[in-house]
């Protein structure tokens, strides 16, 4: 049992396979995984051979006393039930975003994690991005002056989701960034949805919100021919441009103001 890692993975699709790759890289121990689609877990088993152990079901992972941490890389529709069971079994829990799609379920999971003194963490990786941290420092030091407007664009061609809109899939990252930068209450004033491919799923969305006197817009799309990850901040002294896809000059401060 000592050769089994304390972290198990449930869900080995697109993001789950990426997480599995990372787990394999950072440890020499075996990783327990489970996916209801056997072909997904079989692909990882074929790739990593004896480094992967495939559980028969989720309960096998929940009841395993060796497992202390569970990563959920599953659909939002099942995250609540799986997450609740993991916390009831007193496991620390990391959930790929969005954790859930309604406030009531999220509140219940938070309450349960606190009750059992366990970690509940969402997959908001930009909170650990060095450029985002630098932007926060620039704002805090007042280099931009009074921040007046922020526009964030997150676009690419796919992957197209079947259960959630693009603002849940992509825009949730940007909401977490804004929360990190200012740590203030955000008030959504408008949400525009464009359903292009399916009637009930929004492929392109625009969220308008206020953070105090700061006006913000978050544009999300998985129907864009190129991958874009951009943040523009307009201040009373200077402007800031962050282009994550620009390898040569990601972060610029411009001597322009409004």
Residue map of PLM features:
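A short helix->loop->beta-strand "cap" motif at the edges of active sites that frequently abuts
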Residues: 28-29, 52, 89-91, 116-119, ...
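Contiguous beta-strand/loop segments that form the cofactor/metal-binding neighborhood of enzyme cores
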Residues: 172-252
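Hydrophobic residues in well-ordered beta-strands that form the structural core
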Residues: 95-96, 120-122, 242
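A contiguous active-site-proximal alpha/beta segment in oxidoreductase catalytic domains
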Residues: 77, 100-158
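Beta-loop-alpha module in the N-terminal Rossmann-like domain of NAD(P)-dependent dehydrogenases
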Residues: 19, 53-112
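N-terminal Rossmann-like dinucleotide-binding module
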Residues: 1-48
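Short, conserved SAM-binding/catalytic segment
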Residues: 43-51, 108-115
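Mid-domain beta-loop-alpha active-site segment that forms a flexible
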Residues: 123-130, 156-187, 203
């Amino acid at each position: 049992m000592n050769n089994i890692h304390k972290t198990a993975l449930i869900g080995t699709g697109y993001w789950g396979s990426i997480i599995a790759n990372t787990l394999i890289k950072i440890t020499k121990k075996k990783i327990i995984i489970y996916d209801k689609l056997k072909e997904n877990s079989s692909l990882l088993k074929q790739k990593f051979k004896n480094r992967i152990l495939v559980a028969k079901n989720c309960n096998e992972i929940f009841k395993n006393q060796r497992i202390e941490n569970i990563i959920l890389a599953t659909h939002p529709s099942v995250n609540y039930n799986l997450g609740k069971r993991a916390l009831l079994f007193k496991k620390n829990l990391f959930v790929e975003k969005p954790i859930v799609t309604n406030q009531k379920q999220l509140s219940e999971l938070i309450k349960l994690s606190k009750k059992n003194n366990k970690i509940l963490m969402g997959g908001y990786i930009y909170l650990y991005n060095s450029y985002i941290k630098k932007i926060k420092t620039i704002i805090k030091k007042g280099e931009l002056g009074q921040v007046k407007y922020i526009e964030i664009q997150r676009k690419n061609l796919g992957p197209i989701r079947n259960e959630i809109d693009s603002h849940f899939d992509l825009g949730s990252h940007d909401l977490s960034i804004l929360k990190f930068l200012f740590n203030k209450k955000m008030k959504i004033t408008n949400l525009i949805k464009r359903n292009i491919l399916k009637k009930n799923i929004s492929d392109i969305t625009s969220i308008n919100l206020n953070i105090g006197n700061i006006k913000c817009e978050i544009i999300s799309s998985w129907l864009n021919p190129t991958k874009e990850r951009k943040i523009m901040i307009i201040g009373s002294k200077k402007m800031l441009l962050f282009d994550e896809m620009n390898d040569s000059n990601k972060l610029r401060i411009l001597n322009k103001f409004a």
